[in-house]
Protein backbone atom coordinates (compact mmCIF):
# COMPACT_ATOMS: atom_id res chain seq x y z
CA UNK A 1 0.00 0.00 0.00
CA UNK A 2 1.55 3.28 -1.18
CA UNK A 3 0.35 6.60 0.29
CA UNK A 4 0.54 9.88 -1.66
CA UNK A 5 0.38 13.26 0.08
CA UNK A 6 1.00 16.90 -0.82
CA UNK A 7 3.81 19.03 0.63
CA UNK A 8 3.14 22.09 2.83
CA UNK A 9 3.81 25.81 2.55
CA UNK A 10 4.67 25.98 6.26
CA UNK A 11 8.23 24.82 6.91
CA UNK A 12 10.30 24.17 10.04
CA UNK A 13 14.06 24.21 9.68
CA UNK A 14 14.71 25.24 13.29
CA UNK A 15 13.65 22.24 15.36
CA UNK A 16 16.15 19.34 15.20
CA UNK A 17 14.81 16.28 13.35
CA UNK A 18 13.89 13.06 15.14
CA UNK A 19 16.79 11.23 13.48
CA UNK A 20 19.99 11.95 11.58
CA UNK A 21 19.12 9.20 9.10
CA UNK A 22 18.44 10.67 5.67
CA UNK A 23 18.25 9.94 1.96
CA UNK A 24 18.85 12.02 -1.15
CA UNK A 25 15.97 13.04 -3.45
CA UNK A 26 15.81 11.00 -6.66
CA UNK A 27 15.17 13.94 -8.98
CA UNK A 28 17.71 16.57 -7.89
CA UNK A 29 18.91 16.99 -11.47
CA UNK A 30 15.36 17.98 -12.41
CA UNK A 31 15.17 20.29 -9.39
CA UNK A 32 18.38 21.98 -10.55
CA UNK A 33 16.76 22.70 -13.94
CA UNK A 34 13.78 24.35 -12.24
CA UNK A 35 16.00 26.33 -9.88
CA UNK A 36 17.92 27.73 -12.86
CA UNK A 37 14.61 28.97 -14.29
CA UNK A 38 13.55 30.42 -10.93
CA UNK A 39 16.89 32.18 -10.41
CA UNK A 40 16.10 34.34 -13.44
CA UNK A 41 12.93 35.66 -11.79
CA UNK A 42 12.92 38.99 -9.96
CA UNK A 43 11.07 39.32 -6.63
CA UNK A 44 8.37 41.19 -8.55
CA UNK A 45 8.09 38.31 -11.03
CA UNK A 46 7.75 35.85 -8.15
CA UNK A 47 5.09 37.95 -6.42
CA UNK A 48 3.00 37.97 -9.60
CA UNK A 49 3.62 34.33 -10.54
CA UNK A 50 2.95 32.88 -7.08
CA UNK A 51 0.39 35.50 -5.98
CA UNK A 52 2.30 36.22 -2.78
CA UNK A 53 3.30 39.33 -0.82
CA UNK A 54 6.48 41.25 -1.55
CA UNK A 55 8.04 39.89 1.65
CA UNK A 56 7.38 36.25 0.70
CA UNK A 57 8.52 36.95 -2.87
CA UNK A 58 11.79 38.41 -1.58
CA UNK A 59 12.32 35.45 0.75
CA UNK A 60 11.85 32.97 -2.08
CA UNK A 61 14.07 34.92 -4.47
CA UNK A 62 16.79 34.61 -1.81
CA UNK A 63 16.08 30.89 -1.38
CA UNK A 64 16.36 30.29 -5.12
CA UNK A 65 19.63 32.24 -5.19
CA UNK A 66 21.12 30.25 -2.30
CA UNK A 67 19.93 26.82 -3.48
CA UNK A 68 22.62 24.17 -3.84
CA UNK A 69 22.50 20.50 -4.87
CA UNK A 70 25.17 19.77 -2.24
CA UNK A 71 22.92 18.50 0.52
CA UNK A 72 23.88 17.37 4.00
CA UNK A 73 22.10 17.04 7.33
CA UNK A 74 23.85 20.31 8.28
CA UNK A 75 22.24 22.52 5.63
CA UNK A 76 19.03 20.60 4.84
CA UNK A 77 16.29 18.65 6.64
CA UNK A 78 14.28 15.51 5.96
CA UNK A 79 10.99 16.32 4.20
CA UNK A 80 8.73 14.59 6.74
CA UNK A 81 10.16 16.76 9.54
CA UNK A 82 10.48 19.98 7.51
CA UNK A 83 6.87 20.25 6.29
CA UNK A 84 4.51 21.64 8.95
CA UNK A 85 1.09 22.19 7.33
CA UNK A 86 -2.29 20.72 8.31
CA UNK A 87 -1.58 17.30 6.77
CA UNK A 88 1.65 17.07 8.75
CA UNK A 89 -0.04 18.18 11.97
CA UNK A 90 -2.39 15.24 11.46
CA UNK A 91 0.47 12.87 10.69
CA UNK A 92 2.58 13.99 13.69
CA UNK A 93 5.93 12.63 12.47
CA UNK A 94 7.74 13.72 15.63
CA UNK A 95 6.11 10.86 17.57
CA UNK A 96 7.08 8.05 15.16
CA UNK A 97 9.00 5.12 16.58
CA UNK A 98 12.06 3.91 14.60
CA UNK A 99 9.97 1.02 13.24
CA UNK A 100 7.14 3.34 12.21
CA UNK A 101 9.60 5.71 10.56
CA UNK A 102 11.02 2.81 8.57
CA UNK A 103 7.52 1.88 7.35
CA UNK A 104 6.81 5.53 6.57
CA UNK A 105 9.96 5.74 4.44
CA UNK A 106 8.79 2.70 2.51
CA UNK A 107 5.09 3.51 2.13
CA UNK A 108 4.72 7.31 2.00
CA UNK A 109 5.56 9.56 -0.95
CA UNK A 110 5.29 13.36 -1.05
CA UNK A 111 4.48 15.05 -4.36
CA UNK A 112 6.45 18.28 -4.84
CA UNK A 113 6.59 21.01 -7.45
CA UNK A 114 10.36 21.37 -7.05
CA UNK A 115 11.45 17.87 -6.05
CA UNK A 116 8.92 15.76 -7.97
CA UNK A 117 8.44 12.81 -5.64
CA UNK A 118 10.02 12.71 -2.20
CA UNK A 119 10.56 9.92 0.27
CA UNK A 120 9.99 11.05 3.86
CA UNK A 121 13.69 11.03 4.78
CA UNK A 122 14.85 12.80 1.60
CA UNK A 123 16.69 16.00 2.48
CA UNK A 124 15.22 19.26 1.22
CA UNK A 125 16.12 22.92 1.43
CA UNK A 126 13.56 25.64 2.24
CA UNK A 127 11.52 26.42 -0.88
CA UNK A 128 8.14 27.41 -2.21
CA UNK A 129 7.08 26.19 -5.64
CA UNK A 130 3.56 24.85 -5.76
CA UNK A 131 2.67 22.28 -8.40
CA UNK A 132 0.00 24.54 -9.90
CA UNK A 133 2.48 27.37 -10.57
CA UNK A 134 2.43 28.46 -14.22
CA UNK A 135 6.22 28.52 -14.43
CA UNK A 136 7.33 28.47 -18.07
CA UNK A 137 10.27 26.10 -18.48
CA UNK A 138 12.19 24.27 -21.24
CA UNK A 139 9.60 21.46 -21.23
CA UNK A 140 6.41 23.52 -21.35
CA UNK A 141 4.24 26.23 -19.87
CA UNK A 142 3.89 24.85 -16.34
CA UNK A 143 5.13 22.25 -13.86
CA UNK A 144 2.71 19.60 -15.12
CA UNK A 145 4.43 19.86 -18.50
CA UNK A 146 7.82 19.81 -16.83
CA UNK A 147 7.25 16.61 -14.86
CA UNK A 148 5.38 14.87 -17.69
CA UNK A 149 5.33 11.09 -17.14
CA UNK A 150 8.25 11.12 -14.70
CA UNK A 151 6.22 11.10 -11.49
CA UNK A 152 3.73 8.50 -12.71
CA UNK A 153 6.60 6.15 -13.53
CA UNK A 154 8.17 6.81 -10.12
CA UNK A 155 4.87 6.07 -8.35
CA UNK A 156 4.47 2.85 -10.34
CA UNK A 157 7.97 1.77 -9.33
CA UNK A 158 7.23 2.56 -5.69
CA UNK A 159 3.95 0.61 -5.81
CA UNK A 160 5.70 -2.40 -7.33
CA UNK A 161 8.16 -2.34 -4.43
CA UNK A 162 5.27 -2.59 -1.93
CA UNK A 163 4.22 -6.04 -3.07
CA UNK A 164 0.61 -5.04 -3.77
CA UNK A 165 -1.15 -2.64 -6.14
CA UNK A 166 -3.01 -0.30 -3.77
CA UNK A 167 -2.41 3.46 -4.02
CA UNK A 168 -4.02 5.64 -1.34
CA UNK A 169 -4.33 9.16 -2.74
CA UNK A 170 -4.31 11.63 0.15
CA UNK A 171 -2.89 14.45 -1.98
CA UNK A 172 -4.76 17.56 -3.10
CA UNK A 173 -6.15 17.80 -6.63
CA UNK A 174 -3.46 20.36 -7.50
CA UNK A 175 -0.71 17.87 -6.78
CA UNK A 176 -2.38 14.67 -7.92
CA UNK A 177 -2.90 16.25 -11.37
CA UNK A 178 0.84 15.69 -11.87
CA UNK A 179 0.08 11.95 -12.00
CA UNK A 180 -1.31 10.35 -15.18
CA UNK A 181 -4.20 8.48 -13.63
CA UNK A 182 -4.75 6.12 -16.59
CA UNK A 183 -1.10 5.07 -16.58
CA UNK A 184 -1.05 4.05 -12.92
CA UNK A 185 -0.24 0.38 -12.42
CA UNK A 186 -2.41 -0.01 -9.36
CA UNK A 187 -5.80 0.34 -7.73
CA UNK A 188 -6.34 4.02 -6.93
CA UNK A 189 -8.26 4.80 -3.73
CA UNK A 190 -9.09 8.43 -2.89
CA UNK A 191 -10.61 8.80 0.60
CA UNK A 192 -13.07 11.65 1.19
CA UNK A 193 -13.56 13.34 4.57
CA UNK A 194 -16.74 15.28 5.38
CA UNK A 195 -17.69 17.18 8.51
CA UNK A 196 -21.23 18.11 9.56
CA UNK A 197 -21.89 21.83 9.31
CA UNK A 198 -25.02 23.92 8.73
CA UNK A 199 -27.26 20.88 8.43
CA UNK A 200 -25.17 18.83 6.01
CA UNK A 201 -21.94 16.88 5.61
CA UNK A 202 -19.38 18.74 3.52
CA UNK A 203 -15.66 18.78 2.81
CA UNK A 204 -14.11 21.50 4.98
CA UNK A 205 -10.58 22.15 3.75
CA UNK A 206 -8.81 22.58 7.11
CA UNK A 207 -10.41 19.48 8.62
CA UNK A 208 -9.97 17.41 5.45
CA UNK A 209 -6.26 18.21 5.21
CA UNK A 210 -5.67 17.22 8.81
CA UNK A 211 -7.74 14.05 8.30
CA UNK A 212 -5.54 13.07 5.34
CA UNK A 213 -2.53 13.24 7.61
CA UNK A 214 -4.29 11.29 10.35
CA UNK A 215 -5.27 8.56 7.89
CA UNK A 216 -1.70 8.30 6.59
CA UNK A 217 -0.51 7.87 10.17
CA UNK A 218 -3.28 5.34 10.87
CA UNK A 219 -2.12 3.22 7.92
CA UNK A 220 1.43 3.26 9.30
CA UNK A 221 0.43 2.63 12.93
CA UNK A 222 -2.08 -0.14 12.21
CA UNK A 223 -0.08 -1.62 9.32
CA UNK A 224 -3.19 -1.44 7.14
CA UNK A 225 -2.89 -3.67 4.07
CA UNK A 226 -6.39 -3.76 2.56
CA UNK A 227 -9.29 -1.45 1.74
CA UNK A 228 -11.47 -3.29 4.25
CA UNK A 229 -8.97 -2.54 7.00
CA UNK A 230 -8.87 1.11 5.88
CA UNK A 231 -12.63 1.39 6.44
CA UNK A 232 -12.00 0.88 10.17
CA UNK A 233 -10.35 4.34 10.34
CA UNK A 234 -11.90 6.02 13.38
CA UNK A 235 -9.41 8.71 14.43
CA UNK A 236 -10.71 12.03 15.85
CA UNK A 237 -14.36 10.99 15.52
CA UNK A 238 -14.43 10.02 11.83
CA UNK A 239 -16.31 6.91 10.76
CA UNK A 240 -16.86 5.09 7.47
CA UNK A 241 -20.10 5.76 5.58
CA UNK A 242 -21.21 2.88 3.38
CA UNK A 243 -24.06 5.01 2.01
CA UNK A 244 -21.94 7.91 0.76
CA UNK A 245 -18.92 5.89 -0.38
CA UNK A 246 -18.08 4.94 -3.96
CA UNK A 247 -15.94 1.91 -4.91
CA UNK A 248 -12.74 3.94 -5.16
CA UNK A 249 -13.79 6.82 -2.90
CA UNK A 250 -14.41 5.60 0.66
CA UNK A 251 -16.13 8.42 2.53
CA UNK A 252 -15.64 9.18 6.20
CA UNK A 253 -17.99 11.40 8.18
CA UNK A 254 -17.69 13.33 11.41
CA UNK A 255 -20.26 15.15 13.48
CA UNK A 256 -20.02 18.89 14.19
CA UNK A 257 -16.88 19.96 16.03
UniProtKB/Swiss-Prot annotation:
InterPro entries: YaaA. One of its GO terms (biological process) is response to hydroperoxide. Pfam families: H2O2_YaaD. GO terms for cellular component: cytosol. NCBIfam families: PRK02101.1-1, PRK02101.1-3. Belongs to the UPF0246 family. This is UPF0246 protein Shewana3_3143. It comes from Shewanella sp. (strain ANA-3).
Amino acid sequence: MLILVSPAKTLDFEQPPLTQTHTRPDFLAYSQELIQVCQRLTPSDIATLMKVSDNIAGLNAARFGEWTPDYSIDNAKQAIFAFRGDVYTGFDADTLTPEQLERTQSQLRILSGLYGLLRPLDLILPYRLEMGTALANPKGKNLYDFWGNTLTEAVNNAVAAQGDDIIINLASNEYFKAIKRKQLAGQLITPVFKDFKNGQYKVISFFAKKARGMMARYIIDQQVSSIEELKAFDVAGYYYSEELSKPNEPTFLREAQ
